[in-house]
Amino acid sequence: MRTPGSMKGLEELGRVRLSKNFFFRDFLFSEIANFYAIPNIPEDPDLAIEAGRRLCEELLEPLQATFGRLHLRSGYRCAKVNEFGNKNNLNCSSNANTAADHIWDRRDAKGFTGATACVVFPWLVDNYNDDGDWQKMAWWIHDHLPYASIMVFPKLWAMNIQWHEKPARRIRSFAEPRGVLTKIGMPNNEGDHSEHYVGFPALKR
């Protein structure tokens, strides 16, 4: 697919189905792009679609099937939008660090593909409200799904959930308790963690 050069072309990209319940258009909205009038359009739509499909099929679909509707806070971010956000302190890391992350259509420095979406789980915030309860969902995902990395934020316990060809299996948080919950090499990265999410539903697909 060519890079969209018109509204009609962008419509066609938006109609691309990434999985059973998700289309590319679901991931195109960006507050930065919207407010500052920067088109959020991929330079390499085919690569963005490929990575987005893996994200949706392997992570978002089973999460939605298990926990109900997901609220998508953000998804795809083109390099131009991300660079603007980085230079203007709008909570965007550098393009190099965001490739194969929110920038779905750029490979990372090692040539791997990846894609990230920021997700809120209404089921989680409706059922849990104690400090640190986000860890229940994080451990459930860790035990059940092939995620690459998770970053947790304080507001609504929104989570950046990444699919990547070379998963780091790392969970970090800006919500309390802050820091690294697990990563490859830590003793808690392996094994079963079901004691942390007692009462959670079984995985559905």
Would you name each region that the model predicts?
Residues M1-P45:
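N-terminal, Lys/Arg- and Ser/Thr-rich interaction peptides
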Residues R15-N21, F27-L28, L59, G68, ...:
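Alpha-helical protein-protein interaction elements
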Residues N21-F22, D26-L28, N34, T66, ...:
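Intrinsic disorder/low-structure terminal segments
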Residues F23, I32, L72, H193-H196:
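A general marker of short, structured functional hotspots
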Residues F29-H142:
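Cell-envelope/glycan interface and biosynthesis
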Residues I103-R205:
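Catalytic cores and adjacent binding grooves of peptidoglycan-active enzymes
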